[in-house]
Design a protein with these regions (language model features):
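Hydrophobic Val/Ile/Leu positions in short beta-strands of Rossmann-like dinucleotide-binding domains
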Residues: 35-36, 95, 181
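Rossmann-like NAD(P)-binding element
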Residues: 75-78, 83-117, 121-130
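General beta-strand structural signal in soluble alpha/beta enzymes
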Residues: 80, 154-159, 204-207
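Phosphate-coordination loops involved in phosphoryl transfer and adenosine-cofactor binding
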Residues: 29-32, 115, 176
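Rossmann-fold NAD(P)-binding glycine/threonine-rich loop
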Residues: 122-165, 169-171
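Active-site-lining helix/loop region of Rossmann-like oxidoreductase modules
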Residues: 177-241
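NAD(P)+-binding Rossmann beta1-loop-alpha1 motif at the extreme N-terminus of oxidoreductases
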Residues: 2-69, 73, 198
Length: 241
C-alpha cells in the first residue's frame, strides 16, 4: 500500500484528519501582555494575576506617570506606560477601559493596535436605583464595536466575569472561574484561552464568535445582582467540559 492509498478511505475518498484536541493550546508564556485601562480595578487586577503567573505585563493609561505608579505598586516586573506605548510594545492587548471611553480610546490607537491580538473585556452597563442593566451598543456589543474600529487588529473578547476584588487580593491564590472567550479565528481564541489558563484556577472556554458577545457582556449585570444579594464575588463555571 502506498502512502497515497493510506490517506484514503475504502471508498477512495480522502481520509479526514483527526479532530484537534480543544485543550491542546499554545504556549503563550513568552508573549508581552499590555492592559489598556491598567490603572482601573479590573485592568489592574488582571495585570497583577498575569504578572504573578510569570507573564510580562505592561499597564497603560492616558497618563504615563499614573501607569508607572500603579506598576510599581503591583510589582512582579510590571511596567507602566501611556496607552500608545503600551499598545506598540505588546503582543496581546487587553482592553479594560470604562465603556464611556471605549470607542474614543480604540479609535485613537488604531495604528498602534494594527496587527495586534486585542482582547476586549469591557461590559456596557447602565445603573439606576434598581441596579445594573445591560446596554446595547449600536454595533451589537463592545467587542463588535472594537472590531469595527480596529479593522487591522485581531479582535477577541474575554475576561468579562471576573471580580476585581478577588483579582487584586494577594491572599487569594486561585481564581475559581471559567473565562468565556469569543473570536473569529480559532488560533486567536486559543491564544486567549491559554492566557486565561496561566492564572491558577482559571480555564479559557471557547464561547462562540463575536456576534455572541452581547449576551456574554450583558451577563455581568446578572452577576452584580447575585453579588449584591449574597454578598459574594460570583464567577462562572461551565459544566461537562
Amino acid at each position: 500500500m502506498t502512502s497515497t492509498d493510506s490517506a484514503q478511505t475504502p471508498t477512495g475518498a480522502p481520509a479526514k484528519a483527526p479532530a484537534k484536541d480543544p485543550w491542546d493550546l499554545p504556549d503563550v508564556s513568552g508573549l508581552v501582555v499590555g492592559v489598556l485601562g491598567g490603572t482601573g480595578p479590573q485592568g489592574k487586577g488582571l495585570a497583577y494575576r498575569l504578572a504573578k503567573a510569570g507573564q510580562k505585563v505592561i499597564i497603560g493609561s492616558r497618563a504615563a506617570d499614573r501607569a508607572r505608579a500603579a506598576a510599581e505598586e503591583l510589582g512582579h516586573g510590571v511596567e507602566g506606560a501611556d496607552n500608545a506605548e503600551t499598545a506598540r510594545r505588546s503582543d496581546i492587548v487587553i482592553v479594560a477601559v470604562p465603556w464611556e471611553g471605549h470607542g474614543k480610546t480604540l479609535e485613537s490607537l488604531r495604528e498602534e493596535l494594527a496587527g495586534k491580538l486585542v482582547v476586549d473585556c469591557v461590559n456596557p452597563l447602565g445603573f439606576d436605583k434598581k441596579g445594573a442593566y445591560a446596554l446595547k451598543p449600536e454595533e451589537g456589543s463592545a467587542a463588535q464595536q472594537a472590531a469595527a474600529l480596529l479593522p487591522d487588529s485581531r479582535v477577541t473578547a474575554a475576561f468579562h466575569h471576573l471580580s476585581a476584588v478577588l483579582l487584586q487580593d494577594p491572599e487569594i491564590d486561585e481564581i475559581d472561574t471559567d473565562v468565556m472567550v469569543l473570536g473569529e479565528e480559532r488560533a486567536d481564541v486559543e491564544i486567549v484561552q491559554a492566557l486565561a489558563g496561566r492564572i491558577p484556577g482559571m480555564r479559557g472556554i471557547f464561547a462562540g464568535r463575536l456576534r455572541n458577545a452581547h449576551q456574554v457582556e450583558s451577563l455581568v449585570a446578572n452577576l452584580i445582582s447575585v453579588n449584591r444579594r449574597y454578598k459574594a464575588h460570583a464567577g462562572l463555571r461551565v459544566t461537562d467540559v
